[in-house]
């Protein structure tokens, strides 16, 4: 996404409020109207619900309620604006541990067979090691909130990097089929705008 739009945060109160609430902010503008109702969006998100990692899964990514545990709604609507939450679970497998086990396995087999293992054979061994370690691996969880303002044509992602925001937008795109957005460029640097808020 290379096309950008210019926004003056100081004169756009809905976005200003979201900026103050989100710890990080990646802001995008819809290039076409977002016409999905909250109910329709809810049904689409249900097709990509978050489920925990199984014993052989490296990661899982899906939607959870933005209001936390004890609630089931995947879309929280207020005054025509929508709040979503994506949850990700990842298995933690240190590459150094995998490499050490692989090196030992390769050394043993090469000694037994009296030949060097081919690249494909090493890749197969690595896959076997991963499958052995995955059920015992620690997991890491993260949640990312999205705020949609269809009326004004904006979507904000509470992400510290464009890469993380793009991953979440890709999940939303997968859920609803299409998500035409472009990143927004600011007229004023964030530090100047925030200083103006405090004055």
Report the location of each language-model feature.
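N-terminal amphipathic/basic-hydrophobic helices that include classical n-h-c signal peptides
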Residues: 1-18
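N-terminal alpha-helical "arm" segments
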Residues: 16-40
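Short, flexible turn/loop "capping" segments at secondary-structure junctions
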Residues: 20-21, 77, 147-150
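Short cationic amphipathic helices and targeting signals
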Residues: 26-29, 82-85, 153-159
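Primarily extracytoplasmic ectodomains and periplasmic/lumenal surface modules that are beta-strand-rich
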Residues: 35, 91-93, 163-165
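Surface-exposed, low-hydrophobicity interaction/linker segments
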Residues: 39-145
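Internal, hydrophobic cores of structured domains that mediate oligomerization or house catalytic pockets
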Residues: 115-186
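Short, conserved secondary-structure transition motifs
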Residues: 183-199
């Amino acid at each position: 996404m290379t096309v950008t739009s210019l926004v003056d945060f100081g004169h756009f109160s809905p976005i200003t409020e979201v900026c103050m609430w989100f710890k990080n902010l990646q802001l995008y503008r819809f290039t076409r109207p977002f016409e999905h109702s909250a109910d329709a969006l809810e049904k689409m998100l249900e097709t990509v619900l978050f489920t925990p990692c199984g014993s052989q899964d490296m990661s899982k990514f899906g939607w959870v309620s933005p209001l936390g545990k004890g609630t089931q709604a995947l879309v929280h609507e207020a005054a025509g604006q929508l709040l979503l939450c994506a949850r990700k679970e990842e298995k933690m497998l240190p590459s150094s541990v995998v490499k050490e086990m692989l090196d030992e396995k390769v050394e043993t087999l090469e000694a037994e067979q009296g030949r060097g293992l081919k690249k494909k054979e090493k890749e197969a061994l690595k896959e076997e090691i991963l499958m052995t370690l995955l059920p015992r691996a620690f997991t890491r969880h993260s949640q990312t909130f999205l705020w949609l303002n269809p009326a004004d044509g904006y979507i904000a992602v509470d992400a510290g990097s464009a890469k993380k925001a793009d991953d979440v937008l890709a999940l939303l795109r997968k859920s609803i089929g299409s998500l035409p957005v472009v990143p927004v460029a600011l007229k004023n640097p964030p530090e100047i705008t925030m200083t103006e808020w405090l004055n």
